[in-house]
């Protein structure tokens, strides 16, 4: 199970590169790739999917607004500050939405 500390560990490394405007460096790119993969793995995990089917997003229980557009934006601008910033924002939204979903799910099972 992916936890918040795994993201924070990568963010600590990436924030240093971001402050120096070096997100496009070879070392930073590896951290960004790892962060992006962790984000996608987390998305699959909370939706209980083996892979992401972008045509079936409306069937997933936890999907932030404009996910497809944001996903495409992150792919295009992954190594830019705004792409990294979007990843962090999406991660925070997924954590909150998943917590809410798990509570609703638990309450439904108790009724």
Named regions from a protein language model:
Residues 2-109:
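Conserved nucleotidyltransferase catalytic core and NTase-mimicking acidic/glycine-rich helix/loop elements
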